[in-house]
């Protein structure tokens, strides 16, 4: 967590520890502070305060979006487990992508039958950093929506995107993106964990997941997470205020790492979309190398990397995302995800790149891999 975020949160852990739904003056002050934080979050994405639904994180936001509609859900094979599992549980349609992580717009158009109520496509892939053209997808959805209206089809059609990985890297303006629902997560921008939001465009009616006191426009009942909301707003403000300069800095760091690895690791495969990729993520594969062993060896030497998303890696599963991109099992098993952030320096990249090469060379030399 960014220290500035923690500083903003601290008063609400102690002196301002009031229930914002209460009627007394101190509680009303906290309620007003939450309202200001909600306004700040809304302003960053070009929305209205009433369109911001605070949740306990991206997974809850995604479940609210996907389970909140009546009808079929269409998504892609490279989505986060929270999207795929929810869509499949509802009998949803899962579309393939090409090797660059892009959805085929004609396939999408064909998949959106009159029974479909929601299309959910991630903005930035969590494992590879590949960026989807959300605006182009929105245009397809709008075209089908217009066609339904002309034919008298009453079922609404919405577009949802999980933009958790896009904060501080890409434009999040909901009007320019053309989306109806958007998931964001405080923990992905140096804010507190277990707090997120779902943007719900005005006029959209969702079924609530949690019923009770009617907080969050009736969609997410329960006493508000005051510290989380305050911290989330501060984290988003910081991320957006430095977005331009940070993208340039991260791009330079990613290029530095990529250049060194390509020069020193024979047969390395960079899993990226060169035209549309987040500067904060570099994913690469080395066939014949066990990715998990590389992660453990690097961790012992002070370098923290991953084999994929934390959720999948924790289960010891092969990345469904890399398999969907067309990688072989050997390439997927030999994949490493390196993320760069606000506190990463060029010196960090120099040291990490040398250690990555060292560990992979050792594995190849001694054949250290699972049978």
Q: What does each of the following model-derived ranges do?
A:
Residues 1-371:
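Pyridoxal 5′-phosphate
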